[in-house]
Amino acid sequence: MKTLVGKKTVAYNQNGEYFVNPLNKKIQKYEISILKEIAKKYDVDGIILDWLRFDDYKMDLSKSTRNAFKKKYGYDPITISFSTNNAKRRQWNSWRTSQLASYVKQASRSVRQTKKDILLGAFILPPEFTECGQDVGKFKSYIDVVLPMSYYKDWDFTPSWVYGKNSGILYDT
C-alpha cells in the first residue's frame, strides 16, 4: 500500500509491517481465491475479513489506485489537499468506501458460491474514523456479522463510547 509523504508516494510501513492495497484487483482476486479455498477445504462456520481500511486519507496512492480514480474523476488524487476537509477529499473517500464495498460484495458472492451457508463478517473501525475509508452502510448487506473494533482505552475514550444507550459504536453500527 502506498501513502503520500511530502510530495512522494512511498510504501506504507507501520512499525516494520507492510500492507497490501485492498483496492488492487490482482490482490482482491488472490485474496478471494484464499477465502474460497478455506471455505471449500476446511470445516469452518465463517470467515471474518480484516484490514478493509486505510490508516489515513492519503492511502492508497499506488499507480493502480490513482489511475482508477483519475479515469472516473479526471484528476490524480495525489493533488488533493488531504489536510483539510474539502470536496475533493470527500469525493476521494466516498470513492474508496465504494471500492471496498464492491470488493466485499465480490468476496461474499464468490465464497457463498463455494459454501452457501458460511457466515461472513468484517472487523470495522468506529464510524467517526472517516479517514479509514470504511462505510459499513455500503457493505453490510453482503455480510452477516459486523465486529466493531472498540479499543476505547487505546484511543482514550470512556466505555460509553462503545456501550452508550443513545450513541456509541454498538448503537451506531
Q: Each predicted region: which residue ranges?
A:
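Glycoside hydrolase catalytic-domain groove-lining segments
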Residues: K72-T173
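Active-site-adjacent "subsite" loops/lids of carbohydrate-active enzymes
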Residues: M1-K41
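A structural motif
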Residues: D43-V44, I143
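Aromatic- and acidic-residue-enriched segments that line the glycan-binding/catalytic groove
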Residues: M1-Q14, W51-S83, K140
